[in-house]
Structures are given as structure tokens and as C-alpha cells.
């Protein structure tokens, strides 16, 4: 099964949307294997968003992510990365489809509520950056037989 990293950003935490995010991933049939509330250090934020280091918004993005705790999660399931991207919606909430997290709750690209890994390599590196192996639970949900052939 594939794993992906998902983070509810400060705006999602402040707006009380963590439960809605978790509910959508659980309803899709994904298994939660890692979950924690994190007060993000500047170093961690800069590592996570390192790909944007040369972009003009990098500084404000780092300040935003360290401003309030975030909820970091690892979800597991068949096609988890691509499915998570669909559940999350387009980066710009104004372009996100209704029924997606950003489409239903987002109003501004700078406050787009949630981050999700964009591919297998990114997922692996983000999971390793945010979680130690001992923080990830290996378990089998009772619903597995009802989800997969």
C-alpha cells in the first residue's frame, strides 16, 4: 500500500477543520498511520519548503507555517498520493472543485488550508522529515476486507 504525507496548515487548525479533513480521508477508506500536532521550527519549515527557497513568497510562507501549530499526518491506501491530491483540490482554492477540501473551505491561495505530497519521492522524503519510523503505526483496520479485493 502507498503512503502519503498530509498537513493541515495553521489556517485549517485555527478554523477548526482538522476533524473535517480526517473524516474525508477516513471516508475514502484510507488508514491513518501517523498523526501529531506540531509547533513547527523555522528549520523544519525551511526544510519542508526548501524547493521554494528562491521564490518571492518563501519568507512569508515560512512565517505562516511557524505561526501556529500544524497537524501532520501519514495516510496509507491504494493510490493514496493521487487520491489525496484529488481530495485536497487545486492549490488555488478559487480554482478547486466543489467537494474538495480547498473547494469547500478555501478562499485564498495564501491560506489554502492543507498540504499534500505531490508524488512518491516527495511523499517518502516528507514522511521521513516529519515522522520517525517509531511514530508510524502498523495496524490493520477491521474495514480492510470491505475496501479491497
UniProtKB/Swiss-Prot annotation:
Extent of the signal sequence: none
Chief location category: cytoplasm
Report the GO molecular function annotations: ATP binding; metal ion binding; nucleoside diphosphate kinase activity
**Quaternary structure?**
Homotetramer.
Q: Which reaction does it catalyse?
A: dZDP + ATP = dZTP + ADP; a 2'-deoxyribonucleoside 5'-diphosphate + ATP = a 2'-deoxyribonucleoside 5'-triphosphate + ADP; a ribonucleoside 5'-diphosphate + ATP = a ribonucleoside 5'-triphosphate + ADP
Known EC number(s)?
2.7.4.6
Which residues does UniProt mark as catalytic?
115 (pros-phosphohistidine intermediate)
Q: Which domain of life is it from?
A: Bacteria
Which GO CC annotations does the UniProt entry carry?
cytoplasm
Q: Which residues bind ATP?
A: 9, 57, 85, 91, 102, 112
UniProt KW keywords: ATP-binding, Cytoplasm, Kinase, Magnesium, Metal-binding, Nucleotide metabolism, Nucleotide-binding, Phosphoprotein, Transferase
The pathway noted for it is: Purine metabolism
What does the function comment of this entry state?
Answer: Major role in the synthesis of nucleoside triphosphates other than ATP. The ATP gamma phosphate is transferred to the NDP beta phosphate via a ping-pong mechanism, using a phosphorylated active-site intermediate.
Q: Which InterPro entries match?
A: NDK-like_dom (IPR034907), NDK-like_dom_sf (IPR036850), Nucleoside_diP_kinase (IPR001564), Nucleoside_diP_kinase_AS (IPR023005)
The protein's name in its UniProt record: Nucleoside diphosphate kinase
| Locations listed in the record | Cytoplasm
Keyword Transferase tagged: yes
GO BP term, pick one: CTP biosynthetic process
Annotated PANTHER family: NUCLEOSIDE DIPHOSPHATE KINASE
Q: Does the keyword Chaperone apply?
A: no
Amino acid at each position: 500500500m502507498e503512503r502519503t504525507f498530509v498537513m493541515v496548515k495553521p489556517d485549517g487548525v485555527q478554523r477548526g477543520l482538522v476533524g473535517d479533513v480526517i473524516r474525508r480521508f477516513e471516508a475514502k477508506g484510507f488508514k491513518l498511520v501517523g498523526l501529531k500536532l506540531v509547533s513547527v521550527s523555522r528549520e523544519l519549515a525551511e526544510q519542508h519548503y526548501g524547493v521554494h527557497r528562491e521564490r518571492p513568497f518563501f519568507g512569508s510562507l515560512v512565517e505562516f507555517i511557524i505561526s501556529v501549530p500544524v497537524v501532520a499526518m501519514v495516510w496509507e491506501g491504494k493510490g493514496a498520493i493521487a487520491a489525496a491530491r484529488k481530495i485536497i483540490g487545486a492549490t488555488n482554492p478559487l480554482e478547486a472543485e466543489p467537494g474538495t477540501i480547498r473547494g469547500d473551505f478555501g478562499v485564498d491561495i495564501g491560506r489554502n488550508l492543507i498540504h499534500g505530497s505531490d508524488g512518491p519521492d516527495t511523499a517518502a522524503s516528507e514522511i521521513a522529515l516529519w515522522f520517525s519510523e517509531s511514530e508510524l503505526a502498523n495496524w490493520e483496520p477491521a474495514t480492510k476486507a470491505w475496501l479491497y479485493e
